[in-house]
Amino acid sequence: MKRRVFLGLPVILGILFYIWYIFHASDNVAYSDYIRLVNSYLPDVTNPAKFFVPDILTRVPITYLGRIINVKLFGYNTYFDMTLGVLSLGAGAAVLALYAERNRSVGYLSFLLIQFVYFSLNKWEMLYNGTGWAHFLAFGCFFYNYYVLERVYGSGGEKKGAMARL
């Protein structure tokens, strides 16, 4: 239990720091990629024709759902996208914590360094980018997939329900 608390604390502190940082270092103003979003998608956010365009392969489909929720519930708020970015980043960090908790060979100092690098501010560009949160979510899903693969095929043998998750 003590190890679990220690491993979860950097994740929670990282999320809280980023939330604080976003609300103190940015404004709820459309800039950068948000200009493109506002001009091309927001006038008719639920129009499927805006989704099925020639460059559909360069777009992450989950962003459309996020954009619809943002426009319908918040009238389009850039903080919503940035907060989704922080939560998605936190999801990836939580999976790293789960892995470290299961794999006892990851020491406390190593884990803290991994979390420090994972939450480093070099990700700021992706946080204020209107669709960066989907990429962080994809990273977290990739880490989770690796975690489940390791549970199924790793040295510890298969855990209950791990194959179903895979």
Question: Where are the model-predicted features located?
Answer:
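Juxtamembrane "helix-exit" motif on the non-cytosolic side of transmembrane helices
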Residues: 22-25, 70-73, 119-129
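Start-transfer (signal-anchor) and selected internal transmembrane alpha helices
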Residues: 1-18
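Membrane-interfacial loop-to-transmembrane alpha-helix junctions, especially the N-terminal start
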Residues: 5-7, 50-54, 103-112, 158-164
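Extracytoplasmic loop-helix module adjacent to an early transmembrane segment
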Residues: 18-57, 67-71
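Membrane-interface micro-motifs in multi-pass membrane enzymes
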Residues: 33, 60, 106-153
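Juxtamembrane segments of multi-pass membrane glycosylation machinery
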Residues: 65-89, 104-105
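Transmembrane-helix motifs of polytopic, lipid-linked glycan transferases
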Residues: 83-107, 111, 144-148
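Short hydrophobic alpha-helices at membrane interfaces in multi-pass membrane enzymes
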Residues: 147-166
